[in-house]
Amino acid sequence: MKVLVIGSGGREHAIVEALARSEYHPKIYAVMGNANPGIRRRAEDYLLEKETNVPAIVQYAQDCNVDMAIIGPESPLAAGLADELELNGIPVVGPRKDAARIEFDKAWTREFMARNNIKGLPKFKVYDDYDDACRYLEDNPDVVVKPAGLTGGKGVKVMGEHMHTLEEAREYVKSVLEHDRVVIEERLKGEEVTIMAFVDGKHVAPMPTVQDHKRAYEDDQGPNTGGMGSYTDNIDLLPFMTLDDYNEGVAIMEQTVKAMEKDVGVPYKGVLYGQFMITRDGMKVVEFNARFGDPEAMNVLSLLKTDFVDICEAIVDGSLDKLKIEFERSATVCKYVVPAGYPDNPVKDAPLTVVEKPEYLVYYASVNERDGKVYTTSSRSLAIVGVADTIADAEILSEEGLSNVQGEFHCRHDIGKERLIRKRIEHMDAIRG
């Protein structure tokens, strides 16, 4: 069996490692924007190409005679890569463009949720006119402002965190409207969590809950990033969650998948990522993504017991309900190594020396490899994942991995530490009253 993986980040390295563990021993082919050393090591062959160059990728898939493709990032989904591969007879794990719109058009997603009475919808407005948006802001200052389109996780601004005055909010709205529609939503109070699920068009198979850390600096300070790291507990829940929270999130995702085929006429196949805020009034949808999260993929795929090839085939042929999907009952802590100065002024081409050991997992991301060393680019470099019986023990292993990375870099040491988790628990206790 031959499987093509599109993407060159930590998420795609985790996908490739999950394939490499399969008892089917698939031959792995890759299309990457940069030559990810972890993927390169596992691949029979690879193409260095923009992940949105649809004709080149389809041609490569045909030349390699692949049996299946797995699309990692959002941009090729938005470019319609899944549609073109399927048209050429190649089954895809990843939704077609009309279904992937749930990620790349936030305005459409909110309107889709409203049309289909999907639960967990915050109050929202969509504007393409600056004056109308400003009038709404004056009456509703406690908001979140986001562009309708893709922003790599960095375009969302929250009043009281990224913006502190109405003037700042107006300025941000103005800058968004220069190239996009703007979505203004009520600011939700609670804890953000990620629930991802395998989806075959009808059936939803959820994974353990993950919490990502978007802010660049310790104690949740600094600018937003693509995600500095994440953790899971040794059950499907996180320490501040209830089973009702989890079940409510999964039910919202099931409702969304059901509505997708009815509303859009295209079944949703691939991974659905639900980002939820646990509030006093239950689970609210912060956003949906049409693929694995990065870093969250590295947590859940490191725990996956069921053969990943079986899961991919079940997604493609609509038989997920016949497959029992199991995860190790362990905790994980993932910490990203990023270039010094990331995200605003990342130091490029800085050398990193990485010692890999069996005590922890290393997933490579946006680095280049020369002469046995890896070199930073402008994006996240590599992630270290600790897997253990408890979050505390997994965190110790991730720190051991970080101590074996030499060079100039930044990371968040506080992810998975007791103090930060305790803060989340106390925050949620206060919210629930």
From Swiss-Prot:
Keywords: ATP-binding, Ligase, Magnesium, Manganese, Metal-binding, Nucleotide-binding, Purine biosynthesis. Residues 111-317 form the ATP-grasp domain. It comes from the Archaea. The keyword Acetylation does not apply. One of its GO terms (molecular function) is metal ion binding. InterPro entries: ATP-grasp, ATP_grasp_subdomain_1, PreATP-grasp_dom_sf, PRibGlycinamid_synth_ATP-grasp, PRibGlycinamide_synth, PRibGlycinamide_synth_C-dom, PRibGlycinamide_synth_C_sf, PRibGlycinamide_synth_CS. Mg(2+) 2 binds at residues 287, 289. It catalyses: 5-phospho-beta-D-ribosylamine + glycine + ATP = N(1)-(5-phospho-beta-D-ribosyl)glycinamide + ADP + phosphate + H(+). Coiled coil: none annotated. Its EC number is 6.3.4.13. GO terms for biological process: 'de novo' IMP biosynthetic process; purine nucleobase biosynthetic process. It holds the Pfam family GARS_C. Mn(2+) 2 binds at residues 287, 289. Binds 2 magnesium or manganese ions per subunit. Pathway: Purine metabolism; IMP biosynthesis via de novo pathway; N(1)-(5-phospho-D-ribosyl)glycinamide from 5-phospho-alpha-D-ribose 1-diphosphate: step 2/2. Belongs to the GARS family. This is Phosphoribosylamine--glycine ligase. It comes from Methanocella arvoryzae (strain DSM 22066 / NBRC 105507 / MRE50). The lineage of its organism: Archaea, Methanobacteriati, Methanobacteriota, Stenosarchaea group, Methanomicrobia. The gene is purD.
